Amino acid sequence: MPNLPHLTPSSLRTLRDVLGKDRLRRNVPLAPYTTFKIGGPADLYFEAQTAEELARAIQVARTLDVPYFLLGMGANILIGDGGFRGLVVRNMADRIDVRPEAGRIWAESGAVVYPNVIDAAVDAGLSGLEHYVGIPSTVGGALWQNLHFLSPPPERTRTMFIEEVLLEAELLTEEGDRRTVGVDYFEFGYDESILHRRDDVVLAATFQLEPGDPARMREIMAANLQWRAERQPPLDPEPSAGSIFKEIEGIGAGRLIDECGLKGTRIGGAEVTHRHANIMINRGGATAADVRALINYVQEVVARETGYELEPEIAFVGEFDPPSDATPVVVPEEDGLVSAEERAVFRNEGVEERRKG
């Protein structure tokens, strides 16, 4: 049994009884469940299929004082090579209920924003969510980070936030209560919400939308997908966690990194992609130690050359080894391609299986 400081044999029996003996798994590699395809094993792993199962898993972990981490699509995070000492609850609660007459759509927090929630809204002629097409996120993750994207073409003059269409959400609070709260509860900001400061868990959310023309919404979706494809690497074949650093008001983090000549910089299997300087990709076999070393290096160079301090946007989860001491190298753009073999490994098995081979 993994060394869990707060887990007694009695506690383990309780977890099995509450979550199901056959559904509580041990020593599960987490790399395949993240968009970075990086991360060691979880001591304990459970997949919640409904909001009720999600609440039950969190409640029993809290009662037993077992460390836990709630995993959605696995974007915007870097899991350490040592994995997670505790219980990882993967949120797969994904029911969706469209209420066209009220202009509303309700979804459990594990529902994937795109395509599932957005397509359901567009098919019902409800507008407001189509702007967030192509961003890997669950409903819970969208509220965690106040999901955002640029306004529709051709203007693209302002940033649109998920808070603008959120009506209310159902929570399991850090105190253990089930509550329905309005948008003001979340104290939203840029990449920010109260969920960063409180141990509340989103169980479901309701969005208030407007009647819209499905054809026009599909046009916006296609334009946004094209815009993203031109500027950001696809997760297949180039796994990433999305933007690595928070934006600096008035100047983009990617612009600073690019001006410092850091595109193509690689440490181990981690690389600053030529497509977008604020995105690092897993070129195959990258470790969390590689990524941490590359993050540190980029921060040091940008601070030295520009005076700006870059702050990571991604969350660091679990146990980390010391950053890699490999020497940074710059890879020419024409070499920044991933082979078909690497694509197959990422898609079917994840990085852990690649290492075994």
Predicted regions and their residues:
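Glycine-rich tight-turn/loop motif centered on a GG-T
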Residues: 43, 152-155, 283-288
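C-terminal structural segment of proteins
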Residues: 78-224, 256-258, 264
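Intrinsically disordered, low-complexity regions enriched in serine, threonine, proline
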Residues: 10, 340, 344, 351-352
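Short, low-complexity, charge-dense intrinsically disordered segments
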Residues: 1, 349-356
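Anion-binding (especially nucleotide phosphate/pyrophosphate-binding) glycine-rich loop
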Residues: 4-145, 149, 356
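Short, basic and Ser/Thr-rich N-terminal targeting/leader segments
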Residues: 64, 71-73, 164-165, 238-239, ...
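Phosphate/pyrophosphate- and phosphate-bearing ligand-binding catalytic cores of soluble enzymes
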Residues: 25-26, 32-35, 77, 172-296, ...
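Eukaryotic N-terminal low-complexity, Ser/Thr- and Lys/Arg-rich leader segments
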Residues: 2-5, 346
